[in-house]
C-alpha cells in the first residue's frame, strides 16, 4: 500500500519542482 502511494506523491512533487525550477 505504501509503495504506490509514495510513487504518486513523488511524481506530484517532482512535477511541482519542475514547474517552480
Swiss-Prot record:
Tissue-by-tissue expression: Expressed by the skin glands.
A single GO cellular-component term on record: extracellular region
Similarity comment text for this entry: Belongs to the bombinin family.
Function: Has antimicrobial and hemolytic activities.
Residues bearing the modification D-allo-isoleucine: 2
Record's protein name: Bombinin-H1/H3
UniProt keyword annotations, A-Z: Amidation, Amphibian defense peptide, Antibiotic, Antimicrobial, Cytolysis, D-amino acid, Hemolysis, Secreted
Superkingdom of source: Eukaryota
Location of the protein in the cell: Secreted
Residue numbers of Isoleucine amide PTMs: 20
Amino acid at each position: 500500500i505504501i509503495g504506490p502511494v509514495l510513487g504518486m506523491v513523488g511524481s506530484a512533487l517532482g512535477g511541482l519542482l519542475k514547474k517552480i525550477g
